[in-house]
């Protein structure tokens, strides 16, 4: 309850105060809360164009008319991230049969993602959000991660409908947690 009141108070602050403040942590918190508040079920999905593991540009708009499952993951070649994406790999036929596209997104380089994709035989594209803009737009970024790393994607899952609206959103705060694969599959039906 207190968090909601605090968040509501933040949004009532005049925009000019934000423009003049030097407290970067406050600004980051404000923008994260604003993103999370605006990215609700039924809202338009933030559009993006990212470089794939095949070194090609891939845009969300390329998939208009299909459902899109976005899986954000912190880092390639780590245990839980591999489990997350291997679960999607092992169920790829289900999604493909429903005219749905799976995209994995992390802040790793496209070259790292290419090796990760090859070693795990993923049938879907892995996209590099190296500049961290898409992770931030979806409210799926850690400002502070393990070992002092900053700007790492949070584990998250989104389902985007054929008209590019968010119909499922799950952002996990604990990196070792996995998304609700059953709920994702249900939303794609």
What residues fall within each predicted segment?
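Short linear motifs centered on Gly/Pro in flexible linkers and helix caps
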Residues: 4, 10-11, 19
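Generic early N-terminus positional signal peaking at residue ~5-7
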Residues: 5-7, 41-42
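Chalcogenol-based redox active-site neighborhoods
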Residues: 31, 35-189
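Cationic, low-complexity basic patches in intrinsically disordered or flexible, solvent-exposed regions
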Residues: 6, 26, 33
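Compositionally biased non-globular segments, especially hydrophobic aliphatic-rich helices
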Residues: 10, 23-25, 48, 160
